[in-house]
Amino acid sequence: MQFSKMHGLGNDFMVVDAVTQNVFFSPELIRRLADRHLGVGFDQLLVVEPPYDPELDFHYRIFNADGSEVAQCGNGARCFARFVRLKGLTNKRDIRVSTANGRMVLTVTDDDLVRVNMGEPNFEPSAVPFRANKAEKTYIMRAAEQTILCGVVSMGNPHCVIQVDDVDTAAVETLGPVLESHERFPERANIGFMQVVKREHIRLRVFERGAGETQACGSGACAAVAVGIQQGLLAEEVRVELPGGRLDIAWKGPGHPLYMTGPAVHVYDGFIHL
């Protein structure tokens, strides 16, 4: 099987063309491939499939390193767009794809960045899903013998965002896994630790569902900005500084889609016998 290794700000992917190759990935195989000592090593596996709708260009599938399939990955979406153009699967700059959660438009810009229409953030608890009686801007949770204030949103996948004074000293390693599997998140969640530098700039670390802390999480950056705007903390255009680098997020508010812009890097091509 041929594959490419790619990354978006250090969030790394194994990307496989299932348009011209006949492939099947079991959870066991994905876990073996994800092993950084015995396999290829990656945060997520991205699979390019033929479209299910003639109006679309491709179907986009995402699997975490633990073998679970998820509906959204923003950094992966940028790498997906770069991959299908590099491999000659399309020459379009606006690439329309379906996911398990709906549809997305991926745009390769003139300066070789990728701009992703991530859709409108959904704050309804049932959409996340999150166990709550009604939608709130801020929720109170108990975890690890602490009282935690957080915002909750779906970006096609579940996110919990906590504001911290300094991301460098945030309890990502201890609080992240506890909140990820908290009983109020029946499908688990991605946990973002957000430091507001100013209204146009945040710093962010994300403990990803099924992957642990990564160098960057695109949907996590989108979620943090959406929650920050909803809570009145942030402007409509925000620079997000992650351990792996910078993303630019823009959202005009309810009724509008949120846009993420950032790089996608091809590292190498490989071949593996399954």
Swiss-Prot record:
Arranged from A to Z, the UniProt key words for this protein are:
Amino-acid biosynthesis, Cytoplasm, Isomerase, Lysine biosynthesis
Please give the InterPro entries that the UniProt record associates with this protein. Answer: DAP_epimerase_AS, DAP_epimerase_DapF
Q: List its EC numbers.
A: 5.1.1.7
Top EC class of this enzyme: isomerase
List the Gene3D superfamilies.
Diaminopimelate Epimerase, Chain A, domain 1
Any Pfam family the entry gives = DAP_epimerase
- Subcellular localization: Cytoplasm
Site note Important for dimerization, residues: 268
**Which cysteines are disulphide-bonded?**
none
Q: Which reaction does it catalyse?
A: (2S,6S)-2,6-diaminopimelate = meso-2,6-diaminopimelate
Sorted alphabetically, the Gene Ontology cellular component annotations on this record are: cytosol
Query: What residues correspond to the site Could be important to modulate the pK values of the two catalytic cysteine residues?
Result: 159, 208
Family indicated by similarity: Belongs to the diaminopimelate epimerase family.
What do we know about how this protein assembles, alone or with others? Homodimer.
**Job description of the protein:** Catalyzes the stereoinversion of LL-2,6-diaminopimelate (L,L-DAP) to meso-diaminopimelate (meso-DAP), a precursor of L-lysine and an essential component of the bacterial peptidoglycan.
* Record protein name field: Diaminopimelate epimerase
